[in-house]
Amino acid sequence: MKAFKQKQVWFVTGSQDLYGPKVLEQVAKNSEQIVNGFNQSDAISMEVVYKPTVKSPREIYAVCQAANSDENCVGIILWMHTFSPAKMWIAGLNELSKPFMHLHTQFNAELPWADINMNYMNTHQSAHGCREFGYIGTRMRKERKVVVGHWQTNDVQAQVDDWCRAAAGWNESQNLRIARFGDNMRQVAVTEGDKVAAQIQFGYEVHAYSLGELNDAINAISENDITAQIDRYASEYIISNELFNDEYQLDRLRKEAKIELGLAQFLKDGEFGAFTNCFENLTGMTGLPGLATQRLMANGIGYGGEGDWKTAAMVRIMKVMGQGRVGGTSFMEDYTYNFGATDQVLGAHMLEVCPSIAASKPRLEVHRHTIGVRCDVPRLLFTAKAGPAINVSTIDLGNRFRIILNELDTVTPPQDLPNLPVASALWEPRPNLSIAAAAWIHAGGAHHSAYSQAISTENIVDFAEMAGAELVIIDADTQIRQFKNELRQNSVYYGLARGL
């Protein structure tokens, strides 16, 4: 079973009528075999749909139009089995609004040394057919991923899957709606941004709603629904008997369940995939949602604290991209440092860290929250599982958006944190904290990020290219002088590209 049950990519093979029916029959047969191989592979998370070989400008244009109008198609894989004159592709590529990947492969892995003849050579022409197609993509300045290698290899299938996941994320971005309750935290700069520019570039919509509208949805929740929700908590988390026997704590938990159910219904009714709130805008609320937000994120909803809609969008997009993979994705904040033999970052937030990243079964506890509405708030406590991860931040530079990515190694805390009443993750940024933090700051990265152990750097690279957005990567090879030069060069490139 594929992780993406409805979304699909189309597989389109290019050729031309010059070859005659016998060769074209072989081309179609080979293409179907590749598609079947991809669909039988556990490495590829999305259904690949075979489409008939295109042999003329009209056929190419028609399949591109069809892809545009098919809501389940998130992109197209293009392969030139034989030579397909690239001028035939101009109208179709101009029409195509979905992402495309250029698969530079060959049906047979090895040459039949003793039997090879010109018939074989003329049938298996990807080596120069794909170069012709590559030229027109470059000439037309089309962003695309190029995957090279034999289609049965693990490396090629992994790259295909990375791109499929990015295409699913891009599709989600085009259809995403984000609800904002309240505004940004007052005086904070990095969470601000141009929502119109974001919708033009990324596709997602951001809409503001009053706390009164949200409270109406919360107050519509019945006591029976709240009781059923408490039972779900008891089955999913570690909860002490003391909490259930304490009338006050149980009342706080019931209020939180009511918030969760009301918020979930509001988001469902409005077809929202992400939301933001702010501790400074809680009029009529019994407290800042803690457990409620954590559980909504665990169910796939994107979230950004203090009105951070850009991070809320990225959390949702990355959750979609990561379907079926081990690991989770969460809203996150760089909170405090552990300087030592290996410098580390302790990431957390006031309340809102997603349990999809938890190393073990979370504990549900009620603790005092002292920012905004000062009250006791139920929340899940855990530490993130050890392993590779990434932090991704999207910022608005005024004339463009920049995506910043830092590769991390999450580690198990050396000691328990008995007095820290929030979920957390301890990580070592690559290449080290000194370089990573300096590069992040030079790039203007936010204190909020979308943290993920399910998404790879390649997924974000592919997504950024689909969006036409600047992406800078901080990894094991980063050096500050080169990184600063990259930022300067990017400023020139993206400044010029806007006018070209």
UniProtKB/Swiss-Prot annotation:
Its cofactor is Mn(2+). InterPro entries: Ara_Isoase_C (IPR024664), AraA_central (IPR055390), AraA_N (IPR055389), AraA_N_sf (IPR038583), Fuc/Ara_isomerase_C (IPR004216), Fucose_isomerase_N/cen_sf (IPR009015), Lara_isomerase (IPR003762). One of its GO terms (molecular function) is L-arabinose isomerase activity. It holds the Pfam family Arabinose_Iso_C. It comes from the Bacteria. It is an enzyme of class 5 (isomerase). Catalyzes the conversion of L-arabinose to L-ribulose. This is L-arabinose isomerase. It comes from Shewanella sp. (strain W3-18-1).
